[in-house]
């Protein structure tokens, strides 16, 4: 048990990071029925912004700037790439999302020269080492799941208690009827992207605290795993995305703990195939029927 404990701790931490990304997938899909393929790339951009700002600015300026820039990027993507295609076939939206993903990667390649950027100044305090249950780890390992759960509670309260949250629930339930009832769909969708981008920025700062560099491909694997978590839990369901993320994080680390780290990534994508074959709606998802 002592040997597996560090892997369990790391698994909970990884699950929290995946959850913050997965919520963005599930929020957008819940309203637009769109898989935002650029989501992982926004995560990568947040990491690069963190690298550049923390290296040259005080932390009390750098951290809010990372959040602000990532939110602006998410908002701009929605307005420029998705809003003009609101009434277009769903395939057009998907192609646009793929195009945005490649655009972000190429812009990042131009800025960085294709070189991974070193994290010169990790965020203080959370990057410090601590001893937990007799094992040495970084404080971010403990902070991540606590902060993730706190943000999820805040998000659920926002969705249930605020006017914009009511609009999000209405649009997710029936997009066309919500429009007819006077819900400001454009504002609702923009806020959805803003929230998802904010959570991604938080997740990126936590995630890249554990890594020495950030490159243009750094958002690929976390983004894909978060997508699997969203599908596993039931894409469109916030609790499902969170549960799926924590389960995947734990399973991956347990596989590493038993000496099969080579197969930890393979397990995640094998799980995606199994879920799609056995229960396509996921653990908490509801079957969606298209209206004629």
Model-identified regions with their sequence ranges:
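Transmembrane alpha-helical segments in multi-pass inner-membrane proteins
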Residues: 18-22, 57-68, 190-200, 206-270
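Helix-loop-helix "hairpin" substructures at the membrane interface of multi-pass membrane proteins
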Residues: 14, 133-214, 238-243
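Membrane-embedded helix boundary and interhelical linker motif in transport proteins
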Residues: 9, 31-76, 80, 85, ...
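Membrane-interfacial amphipathic/re-entrant helices at transmembrane-helix boundaries
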Residues: 1-20, 49, 60-61, 88-93, ...
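Transmembrane helix-bundle core of multi-pass membrane transporters
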Residues: 84-161, 188-191, 254, 259, ...
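Residues that define the loop-to-transmembrane-helix transition and helix capping
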Residues: 38, 60-61, 91-92, 163, ...
